[in-house]
Swiss-Prot record:
Gene (UniProt): TADA2A
Protein residues bound to Zn(2+) 1: 17, 20, 42, 45
Zinc finger (ZZ-type): 12-69
Region of interest: Disordered: 348-372
GO BP terms, alphabetized: chromatin remodeling; regulation of cell cycle; regulation of cell division; regulation of DNA-templated transcription; regulation of embryonic development; regulation of transcription by RNA polymerase II
Subunit organization: Interacts with GCN5 and NR3C1. Associated with the P/CAF protein in the PCAF complex. Component of the PCAF complex, at least composed of TADA2L/ADA2, TADA3L/ADA3, TAF5L/PAF65-beta, TAF6L/PAF65-alpha, TAF10/TAFII30, TAF12/TAFII20, TAF9/TAFII31 and TRRAP. Component of the ADA2A-containing complex (ATAC), composed of KAT14, KAT2A, TADA2L, TADA3L, ZZ3, MBIP, WDR5, YEATS2, CCDC101 and DR1. Interacts with CCDC134.
All residue ranges annotated as the SANT domain in the record: 70-122
Binding, Zn(2+) 2: 31, 34, 55, 59
Name the record gives this protein: Transcriptional adapter 2-alpha
Organism annotation: Homo sapiens (Human)
A molecular function GO annotation: zinc ion binding
Physiological role: Component of the ATAC complex, a complex with histone acetyltransferase activity on histones H3 and H4. Required for the function of some acidic activation domains, which activate transcription from a distant site. Binds double-stranded DNA. Binds dinucleosomes, probably at the linker region between neighboring nucleosomes. Plays a role in chromatin remodeling. May promote TP53/p53 'Lys-321' acetylation, leading to reduced TP53 stability and transcriptional activity. May also promote XRCC6 acetylation thus facilitating cell apoptosis in response to DNA damage.
Amino acid sequence: MDRLGPFSNDPSDKPPCRGCSSYLMEPYIKCAECGPPPFFLCLQCFTRGFEYKKHQSDHTYEIMTSDFPVLDPSWTAQEEMALLEAVMDCGFGNWQDVANQMCTKTKEECEKHYMKHFINNPLFASTLLNLKQAEEAKTADTAIPFHSTDDPPRPTFDSLLSRDMAGYMPARADFIEEFDNYAEWDLRDIDFVEDDSDILHALKMAVVDIYHSRLKERQRRKKIIRDHGLINLRKFQLMERRYPKEVQDLYETMRRFARIVGPVEHDKFIESHALEFELRREIKRLQEYRTAGITNFCSARTYDHLKKTREEERLKRTMLSEVLQYIQDSSACQQWLRRQADIDSGLSPSIPMASNSGRRSAPPLNLTGLPGTEKLNEKEKELCQMVRLVPGAYLEYKSALLNECNKQGGLRLAQARALIKIDVNKTRKIYDFLIREGYITKG
């Protein structure tokens, strides 16, 4: 007979009988061939030869009981559990009620056995001491330092960064200003009543379907932002800057296709092209060495050092190169001489030198989907597109200039530049636009 003690003397703590679903009372039967999970039977179902699915009445079995001694030869495991439960129910020291609940031991036997094996036993004392020491070792004596995280960023409410992030709330993983933020306005006046005509009912259902499609588009954009990690824009820009200029241009071009492919596939594509660029650059460098007749890296280091020295010497001849460049054009030569005179006198150059190559102007800013676009009129949208200024920033600058103009009774360009800490050319265009449209007056 195999004997195994239960965890508790309460029948509800034991598994139910698979035959009659009653709570098991010791002794009970466990099938040695079925399981997991274990297959338990009470004695009544076992004597009836209960069979269920794969379980057969001729399977080998184990008798589960707790009549074996643990701490004392005269105390069974079942009595040990009954003693502990009685002390927990009746309280320590109330040995008469403990003995009455146990029914098999006197109060003197209960007190003597409990004090000997559970209070004065050095084995239990050392075990409890070790557990206490281990618990104290886990608890730090000093305060746990708290470090704020910037991923995702947590800007202060109503700050410029918070508006640029459309009011992203990290604790809720949601935005204050949603994409298509006023989609719910189309539903505010819709009410389904029983006397609606079929056409009116179909029209209302079409409006609801359109609203559902707009919600799906909103969730799709949120998923793209979450999957590609676009919440932390600063971290995204730092990752982009670690690539060479050529790969950054590819990154900028392929960004619009990121919504089609997954984030992992998009990153693999960019990384593969970055690796290709590095390999091409290394091959070009090795080809340059071979063209110069260099066949080992020791000579290549000397070649690179001499090449760097020649480049520095060439840059020192910049003034002579400028003279040779503008000497054929009298007007350009006069401008260059005035510029050099200003530099020699310690003044900033008053006449900028024209570049032959010409700098390509930046394309107009696309305002589609940017927060605050719906608050602008057509002329303001054109201004934001030309100066490449997001609508939220423009509205903030406009409000600051209007408030200052109302306080002073007018506003000068110098005051506007002091209020708006951005590029002076953009400030001039905003100032001229507000003057031209009559929002502010000159001081």
